[in-house]
Amino acid sequence: MKVFDYEDVQLIPNKCIVNSRSECDTTVILGKHAFKMPIVPANMQTIINRSIAEFLAENGYFYIMHRFNGSARIPFVKKMKERQWISSISVGVKKEEYLLIEELAKQGLTPDYITIDIAHGHSNSVIEMIQRIKTHLPETFVIAGNVGTPEAVRELENAGADATKVGIGPGKVCITKIKTGFGTGGWQLAALRWCAKAARKPIIADGGIRTHGDIAKSIRFGATMVMIGSLFAGHEESSGETKIENGIAYKEYFGSASEFQKGEKKNVEGKKIWIQHKGSLKDTLIEMHQDLQSSISYAGGRDLEAIRKVDYVIVKNSIFNGDTI
């Protein structure tokens, strides 16, 4: 198996067939819904919040609400249903999450999407949660993760998952690779390719995205959707503390397995960093959209499918994608 990561790969252009990049269509379908772009902000507390979720849903973007305010999830689904926007939430695998699924079913609330969100998704607990959701909420599109092997993808698909999320520890505020020695950090793009070849259902690439060009690379190597954390951190709308240093504003960004999320220093596999304030989230989404349209034009097509067919070269080798503790 070839081992490489995002900065090791360059995609090779094809003849352009559009008169303007603006003709290129970045639409993607996941489940029963179409979305403006194949991107989703990470379901982390400093990346997604209720107001951002509402903005994304209203404007045709995919989102996954984080699971760190458990009691707010049923009212959240109810509100999104009332507004006729897509409802997309996260769950863990603890027993109280089973009660949430049962209560949603009891109230006749079927979320459009539920993401089972744990660090090591190739586990019996995730398989049991998939089956529990499919029993009580059979119409819900279930995303399961996170995983890093073809065996895991196949097993979760066979258990009933409608999509799998690939990536163990490649994120900017994740230190799983350093703390445990395991994961896809440093070879996330190769892991995505490996898993996508085995998949029969959509793959969501999660982690290691440092540039907008990495979105196109993820599509090329098999992702239907790309989950992004650090590029969506630090915006005006983002949750988290703001600080000013030497006249420059910064916002905090921390991992879901960090002590800042957990509230205690136990089984820590995440860290906190400060991101320079980026302004409006809307402006970042516009820039991402334009850059992805450019990627499609370089691929020689009119839609995302063109990117999947381009050739590529491996230009160098890397290990940790620039990350340290």
From Swiss-Prot:
Binding, NADP(+): 203-226
Record has Oxidoreductase as a keyword: yes
Alphabetized SUPFAM superfamilies for the sequence: Inosine monophosphate dehydrogenase (IMPDH) (SSF51412)
Keyword Ribosomal protein recorded: no
Active-site residues from the entry: C174
One GO molecular-function entry: GMP reductase activity
Any one Gene Ontology cellular component term annotated for this protein: cytosol
One GO term (biological process): purine nucleotide metabolic process
Record keywords, A-Z: NADP, Oxidoreductase
InterPro entries noted in UniProt: Aldolase_TIM, GMP_reductase, GuaC_type_2, IMP_DH/GMP_Rdtase_CS, IMP_DH_GMPRt
Any one Pfam family match given in the protein's UniProt record, by short name: IMPDH
E.C. numbers: 1.7.1.7
Function: Catalyzes the irreversible NADPH-dependent deamination of GMP to IMP. It functions in the conversion of nucleobase, nucleoside and nucleotide derivatives of G to A nucleotides, and in maintaining the intracellular balance of A and G nucleotides.
Family under the similarity heading: Belongs to the IMPDH/GMPR family. GuaC type 2 subfamily.
UniProt name for this protein: GMP reductase
Classification lineage: Bacteria, Pseudomonadati, Campylobacterota, Epsilonproteobacteria, Campylobacterales
